[in-house]
A protein has these predicted regions:
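Structured catalytic/nucleic-acid-binding cores of DNA maintenance enzymes
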Residues: 1-214
Length: 214
C-alpha cells in the first residue's frame, strides 16, 4: 500500500498531467458508472492528498474557486490492491503504475513511461529516471498517432486527457463528495504534516499518544 508521501507526490503528478483540462471520465468496469457520468467533461481543478487519501476536485470551469458549491470532489484510497496505471503519447510523462503491482494499461510496451520527467513525477516508482528513460519517452508516439488502449482488467475509473490516460483498478474507496464531505473525512483522519495547512505539532502530539508504533 502506498504511504502518504507517495500519495502526495501522486496528487502533484496528476495535477501536472491533467490540471486545467476537461477530462473524459469513464468506468469501464461499471461499478462507478454514475460517478463517472457526473464527472465526464468537467475540468480537473487540481489535486490534493491527505494521508493516504487522494482528493480530486472537478468543476464546469477552469477558473472556479474550490469553495464553489458546484465543485464535486472525487475521493480515492488505494488500499492494499488499488493501483493507477498510465499510458500516453510523447507529451505525457508518467510512471507505469502506482500502487499494487500492475502492468501498464493494455500491456502495451512501445512507449515506456518510467519514473517521470518532472518534479512531481520523478521518483514515483521509488527512484529517479533510469538511463535511457527520457530518450524512450521522447520517441513515444506523436499526439496525432497515439490512441488510448483498451482497458485491461476491472478498471473502476478511467481519466482521459489531451495526451494520456490513467486507469484506476481495485481501490478500497472511490466516491464523490461535496466540500462538507471532504472536510468530514479530513477531520476524521487528523492532521497531515505533509500538507501546507497541516498542524505539525498536533500530529506529533497525537503520534506520541499512541501505543502502536508508526
Amino acid at each position: 500500500m502506498p504511504e502518504g508521501h507517495t500519495i502526495h507526490r501522486l496528487a502533484a503528478a496528476l495535477d501536472e498531467l491533467y490540471g486545467g483540462q476537461s477530462l473524459r471520465v469513464r468506468s469501464p468496469q461499471g461499478r462507478f458508472a454514475d460517478g463517472a457520468s457526473r464527472l465526464d467533461g468537467q475540468v480537473l481543478l487540481g489535486s490534493q492528498a491527505h494521508g493516504k487519501h487522494l482528493f480530486l476536485p472537478f468543476g464546469p470551469r477552469v477558473d472556479m474557486s474550490l469553495d464553489d458549491a458546484s465543485v464535486t470532489w472525487l475521493r480515492i484510497h488505494l488500499g492494499l490492491y488499488g493501483a493507477w496505471t498510465f499510458d500516453g503519447d510523447r507529451e505525457f510523462t508518467a510512471p507505469n503504475a502506482i500502487g499494487a503491482p500492475r502492468r501498464r494499461v493494455g500491456e502495451r510496451g512501445e512507449h515506456a513511461l518510467k519514473g517521470g520527467g518532472g518534479s512531481a513525477l520523478t521518483g514515483l516508482n521509488g527512484g529517479s529516471l533510469e538511463p535511457g528513460d527520457r530518450d524512450t519517452a521522447a520517441h513515444g508516439p506523436a499526439p496525432e498517432e497515439w490512441e488510448p488502449p483498451e482497458p485491461r482488467g476491472a478498471v473502476r475509473l478511467r481519466l482521459l486527457g489531451e495526451h494520456g490516460v490513467a486507469d484506476l483498478t481495485g481501490p478500497a474507496a472511490c466516491e464523490l463528495l461535496d466540500a462538507e464531505g471532504v472536510a468530514a473525512v479530513r477531520r476524521r483522519l487528523g492532521p497531515d504534516p505533509l500538507r501546507a495547512d497541516g498542524d505539525v505539532e498536533a500530529f506529533v502530539a497525537k503520534a506520541r499518544s499512541r501505543r502502536k508504533s508508526i
